[in-house]
Amino acid sequence: MNQVVKYSICVPNLNMENTIEEALRSVLDQIDDEYEVIVVDDGSTDRSVEILRSLELEYPNLFVHELPRDPNRILAETRNMSISFARGQYLLLHIDCDDYWYPFIKDFVKVYHEIEKFKGSDFLLSGQQINMGEAKFLKSHGPYQKGHMVEDRDMWYRLAKIGAYVPLDHVVFRKRMKLKQNQILRKKFLLPIEIVRDEIRSGSSLLEFLKLFLDHKHSQNWKYRLYKLIIFPIAWLMAKRMEPLPRTTFNSDWQNLRDKAWSESGTVLHLFKKNGRIFDVGKLSPRAQIIFTHRASEISIEEVL
């Protein structure tokens, strides 16, 4: 294997034995020796580590790091640990152990580098469920703040404030894999409560939640916003028993920043046109040309395949 690693794919894991092998193979089978995959296991009690060690023997660019279980350590800290182990010049983030990735990660990287030619390296390219940035830049801006359940949104907000958040709309080329019942329960019901709790810890009020819901009641996720209003009392009681968080993330300023960024965003063709440039789609693989020239709402990955 080439010892010069250019790209680090950072992956956290906790008790994902039912999806981890298929998820990682979907990534490892589409990359070359310019890439490494860093998996930080957060003290799994299932067969995750056994599966990871077996895969590590099979794939020379997979590196597994085990942490002792700490119930107080949240995902932001685990993600930061994976980043600290990364050797690559560039980081690919938010690739998780319950995601199956279709073979277009390298095309996403090509898109990043084409944008980099006119924007420089000081930005985060935020695609559909996948993010990429220069390691030195991202490490100098956090990357993730401790204490936040929604660690990605916190980082996006801080980068958007300095004009370094570049959203890119494209066909989603990953799918969520089937989870266990307890994992589904956590994602659908418990995690939203923890998210609202931390929004309250950051200073958000019921009035602010109501305003955000009314301002976005016709958006695709209005049901989720309504659910957040309903669980507000439970989250409020939990928040009052915990230390407050800096008011830098969960507020209308963030929502307005992100809404503005996404309202001005589009496909790679739109992004290049806005900057007075023309994107050469021929640099992408044939199916990736479809993926990155269409919005996520226009076509599904199944139609592309």
Regions found by a protein language model. Give the residues of each.
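Conserved donor NDP-sugar-binding/catalytic core segment of glycosyltransferases
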Residues: 99-131
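Short beta-strand-to-loop acidic/aromatic patch adjacent to the donor-nucleotide binding site
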Residues: 88-100
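Active-site donor/metal-binding and catalytic loop motifs
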Residues: 129, 168-206, 210
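Acidic donor-binding loop at a coil-to-helix junction in glycosyltransferase catalytic cores
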Residues: 149-155
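Short, well-formed alpha-helical segments that are part of the catalytic scaffolds
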Residues: 15-29
